């Protein structure tokens, strides 16, 4: 089962779409599940959402291998260069930023993104799912 969430990222002051795959019996099973967090999550499950028209096949792999796992697919930021800002732990120098044909420096929000993962997303998952 896939649960669709929209989460406000406090450390970045913006929203993000998240798909959470849980095993069908997760509510009735008396066990905990490991969690795999997937960045660029729009590519994780469905061909029609993937930027190349073919998903990364996480659902097929989990089902084929009969893995008991919760998959958390966080969509990237689709605003121009915001993906690079969020995944980049430091601001890139002017020469590198020029490769993106921009008049501003790129990157530098990586720590805020990791803060979201560790202080907001993981506690949310721990509260709402058997992790």
Predicted regions and their residues:
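Non-catalytic cap/lid and distal C-terminal segments of serine-dependent acyl enzymes
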Residues: 1-131
